[in-house]
Amino acid sequence: MTNIRKSHPLIKIINHSFIDLPTPSNISSWWNFGSLLGICLILQILTGLFLAMHYTSDTTTAFSSVTHICRDVNYGWIIRYLHANGASMFFICLFIHVGRGLYYGSYTFLETWNIGIILLFTVMATAFMGYVLPWGQMSFWGATVITNLLSAIPYIGTTLVEWIWGGFSVDKATLTRFFAFHFILPFIITALVIVHLLFLHETGSNNPSGIPSDMDKIPFHPYYTIKDILGLLLLVLLLLTLVLFSPDLLGDPDNYTPANPLSTPPHIKPEWYFLFAYAILRSIPNKLGGVLALILSILILALIPTLHMSKQRSMMFRPLSQCVFWLLVADLLTLTWIGGQPVEHPYVIIGQLASILYFSLILIFMPLASTIENNLLKW
């Protein structure tokens, strides 16, 4: 009799995905973040479910329902802060996961990469809508500013914005539909994650050297399950430290003031994980131009496989490309810092220069470095 793990129609799918999966023997800790993202998604769905049991999506009671969760519900405060800071952990893992894909050339798995980009957009949309739900000042004005960007679309812009709002301003209808979308999107994300994994397991994982590793594969369990558990423990340690010692570290104090359409906060800014894109948006004086730059700042990832000029897949043995990559990381950190600063000198010019550098590094310097390295190989 064969093992049920290998014969049962359902269990064998799990077996081929997480147990007997042939995995390269040399993948480093940068490959941990895929499983960590899965854990983050499960955590967000579970904490979100329990929050939804007590939350009311009505403009008059939304803010007080969040206060009620934190004060009156058993362990409500920890569920709320796990959910809020869990989103930050999710994005940290996401950025590292995408950065790993960039560095080691994982984008040559086209289907996996493209589903990943769709996932990134979906997660960003979900996080944005989640930020609106507590109905504080930053929630309300963030929703107003970001949804208003769609009015830059020619002809249909204004109609589209009012259609999304469900009225002539961000109000009860907006909050209700945002809650509905925020609830359903994580399940769509889960479905996309399954497709993402399906495409990945068609080709097998990449590895740091970027060369095929079919002749040197090891089973995923126990080697990488143990390795992933270590990553998980470190993630949980970081998350719990944040939640239990400084839960509001990454939040905005303005969101502890109930939403007031008559009073605009001095600095409207999104959560930290959107600041780089917000800085790119603000660096262009034209509204439509800013919106296009904002979308392109993420969509440019879809061009990366086309821009790959190198004869080698990974950047492991390409020092010039490594320099460009780390410049890009530094530039993104600069943009994140600028996005949180007021619109005044010298922040405006720094933001504009960092935005130009961001697109230049990806579109010009990365292919250029690859071409130079190709020529150096001939010597």
From Swiss-Prot:
It is a multi-pass membrane protein. A ubiquinone binds at residue 201. This is Cytochrome b. It comes from the Eukaryota. The cytochrome bc1 complex contains 11 subunits: 3 respiratory subunits (MT-CYB, CYC1 and UQCRFS1), 2 core proteins (UQCRC1 and UQCRC2) and 6 low-molecular weight proteins (UQCRH/QCR6, UQCRB/QCR7, UQCRQ/QCR8, UQCR10/QCR9, UQCR11/QCR10 and a cleavage product of UQCRFS1). This cytochrome bc1 complex then forms a dimer. GO terms for molecular function: metal ion binding; ubiquinol-cytochrome-c reductase activity. Pfam families: Cytochrom_B_C, Cytochrome_B. Keywords: Electron transport, Heme, Iron, Membrane, Metal-binding, Mitochondrion, Mitochondrion inner membrane, Respiratory chain, Transmembrane, Transmembrane helix, Transport, Ubiquinone. SUPFAM superfamilies: a domain/subunit of cytochrome bc1 complex (Ubiquinol-cytochrome c reductase), Transmembrane di-heme cytochromes. GO terms for biological process: mitochondrial electron transport, ubiquinol to cytochrome c. One of its GO terms (cellular component) is mitochondrial inner membrane. It is found in: Mitochondrion inner membrane. Heme b b566 binds at residues 97, 196. The chain crosses the membrane at residues 33-53, 77-98, 113-133, 178-198, 226-246, 288-308, 320-340, 347-367. Its cofactor is heme b. CDD domains: cytochrome_b_C, Cytochrome_b_N. Binds 2 heme b groups non-covalently. Component of the ubiquinol-cytochrome c reductase complex (complex III or cytochrome b-c1 complex) that is part of the mitochondrial respiratory chain. The b-c1 complex mediates electron transfer from ubiquinol to cytochrome c. Contributes to the generation of a proton gradient across the mitochondrial membrane that is then used for ATP synthesis. InterPro entries: Cyt_b/b6_C (IPR005798), Cyt_b/b6_C_sf (IPR036150), Cyt_b/b6_N (IPR005797), Cytb/b6-like_sf (IPR027387), Cytochrome_b (IPR030689), Cytochrome_b_C_euk/bac (IPR048260), Cytochrome_b_N_euk/bac (IPR048259), Di-haem_cyt_TM (IPR016174). Belongs to the cytochrome b family.
